[in-house]
């Protein structure tokens, strides 16, 4: 497996990490609009990679290609390759159910299902696996613990998830995503609708989750990118301008566009 240099999870000297996801000469079209242009990027395993850039730059589009969610909509086309463990997930031969189980996603706005807290987490598991009642209970508890929510909901698993606070709902969505034990977790501006306290809790959770998952996060908050990510990619108008260690991007960017953006002189 190809490896790239990234910061060690502990902040220790540079360590070698396998490449988990790689885009190769990736182009994307919304009908005739060329939204992404020859993107080449490598996402290291069990690290956090942040995608930053102004609105409309293509960062959320790139994120959604990583689990082919665009396939739900007409007149959208991806060209090139996206390799997950060296397999091209854009190939028609790559099973969608397999992709959904290997790549989880959490959206900007919390979207709990209109069912109990327990059933929110169990829903996806039932779609992909057949577990005994005891095994299902254990899996749900494990996911809620990983989502840092178990202690808050363990006595009300039968209550509606819609009664949770916004921050709790987002952590429930994270628990629901990790319940399938995916390899990759995609986070599309997961804290933009949350208060500062809930945002801080999610950021702490991301730091904990990268021990088990490869994480890609889209954020408009550059301070957040600096806090939570090991790698950062700056995008503009469908191009990948620069991709490097987060500390390098924010302290010694190699591209003037990157420096202008992170210092507020962009425009």
Curated annotation (Swiss-Prot):
The keyword Isomerase does not apply. GO terms for molecular function: ATP binding; ATP hydrolysis activity; ATPase-coupled phosphate ion transmembrane transporter activity. GO terms for biological process: phosphate ion transmembrane transport. The keyword Nucleotide-binding applies. Its EC number is 7.3.2.1. ATP binds at residues 53-60. One of its GO terms (cellular component) is plasma membrane. Keywords: ATP-binding, Cell inner membrane, Cell membrane, Membrane, Nucleotide-binding, Phosphate transport, Translocase, Transport. InterPro entries: AAA+_ATPase, ABC_transporter-like_ATP-bd, ABC_transporter-like_CS, P-loop_NTPase, PstB-like. Its main location: membrane. It is a peripheral membrane protein. CDD domains: ABC_PstB_phosphate_transporter. It is found in: Cell inner membrane. Residues 21-262 form the ABC transporter domain. It catalyses: phosphate(out) + ATP + H2O = ADP + 2 phosphate(in) + H(+). The complex is composed of two ATP-binding proteins (PstB), two transmembrane proteins (PstC and PstA) and a solute-binding protein (PstS). Belongs to the ABC transporter superfamily. Phosphate importer (TC 3.A.1.7) family. Part of the ABC transporter complex PstSACB involved in phosphate import. Responsible for energy coupling to the transport system. This is Phosphate import ATP-binding protein PstB. The gene is pstB.
